UniProtKB/Swiss-Prot annotation:
Main location: secreted
Disulfide-bonded cysteines: C34-C116, C46-C129, C115-C120
Keywords (A to Z) from UniProt: Cleavage on pair of basic residues, Disulfide bond, Hormone, Secreted, Signal
Name of the protein in question: Insulin-like 3
PROSITE patterns the UniProt entry points to: INSULIN
Keyword flag Secreted: yes
SUPFAM superfamilies in the record: Insulin-like
Family: Belongs to the insulin family.
Tagged with keyword tRNA processing: no
Subunit relationships: Heterodimer of a B chain and an A chain linked by two disulfide bonds.
Amino acid sequence: MDPRLPAWALVLLGPALVFALGPAPTPEMREKLCGHHFVRALVRVCGGPRWSTEARRPAAGGDREWLQWLERRHLLHGLVANSNLTLGPGLQPLPQTSHHHRHHRAAATNPARYCCLSGCTQQDLLTLCPY
């Protein structure tokens, strides 16, 4: 047997071993999803428009319907969260914060914006599914 054979075998198989033993991509990696990429990822994770309340209705509008649904859902959530509840005697409303803080808080509650800026995992997207 040629003494150089094991050395050549290591040279040829070394990169394959490094690639095979390297870190495997995890399913929980954050991926920045903006616009229609975000909507398509939601469709992929949630299972498509078949869960719509009107099953017979043809799916028209595609991405636009998804975005409208998300805006409506989070608009209603924002209205409930920001509703001015009746305060008891002696309680004062909190002082108004700056426009910057309100804008930042609004961005934090918008899942499409969050996924675009910070990235989302599949688990994050699953929490947005309507079922």
